[in-house]
Amino acid sequence: MFDTVLVAGLGLMGGSMAKTIKARTLSRVLGWNRTRATAEQALADGPIHAIATDALFREVDLVIIGLYPQATVDWLLENMPKMKKGCVIVDMVGVKQFMVDHLEQAALDAGVHYVGGHPMAGREFSGLDYALPTLFDGASMIFVPTKSSSERILSQLEAYFMSLGFGQTVRCTAEQHDHMIAFTSQLAHVVSSAYIKSPEADKHNGYSAGSYKDLTRVAKLNETMWSELFLCNAEPLACEIDEIIRHLDEYRRV
């Protein structure tokens, strides 16, 4: 189906994707990373078969990219013209309208198929050292069709990602995705981060158990990444923050 797969960005998500693909498919896995040392580490440790070069781009059937939002856009705009016609591209960025707005027409112009993607999995750590070949087991994989994709491409992607261990695939529009993710993911990080800003947080030892652990698990943010994600989805996130403030105010008044 996808004989050669390029994973761009070998951090937690990209590294886990590379490990999963290599372990569970017959695809040849190429890796690209902004820092050469990380790509060399991935080659030495086994998640990839080779480090991607411009010459190898023409051999790639599927690109999966796990960079920050603007870095993903910049990388794809630079490298789409190097890819063979008909290549399929899936990003793993946690916002979708921003991505589609910047990449849909460029994909059409380059003759490649761009599909927005978002694997609903992660850890409270970052980097290749924390990547796992089981990270996506049972998780949901969201696909956002674009004008450059087709039913055939989407069906192929759904089958391929299910073979990687995902529990289900979901299709939606970019707008639907961003509104739901503002609630299910981004708001949770905001609330968790705000919660531990209480002066009582430093005194929790001996007074905390499961509830505290659950609510604070995602409080430690990758500030650079999450700031960019929040700003790219500012309006839906602001609406969700307003909504929870309204409900908290109801509790306060009672």
Tell where the protein language model's regions lie, with residue ranges.
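N-terminal Rossmann-like NAD(P) cofactor-binding module of classical short-chain dehydrogenase/reductase
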Residues: V63-I64, V90
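Short beta->alpha hinge that forms the Motif I/post-I loop of the SAM-binding pocket
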Residues: R34, L67, M92
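Residues at the starts of beta-strands that form the adenosine-phosphate
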Residues: T4, R28, H113, S140, ...
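NAD(P)+-binding Rossmann beta1-loop-alpha1 motif at the extreme N-terminus of oxidoreductases
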Residues: M1-D54, R58
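Interdomain hinge/lid region at the active-site interface
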Residues: K203-V254
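Rossmann-like NAD(P)(H) cofactor-binding subdomain of soluble oxidoreductases
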Residues: L77-D129
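Internal alpha-helical scaffold of NAD(P)-dependent oxidoreductase catalytic cores
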Residues: P133-V218
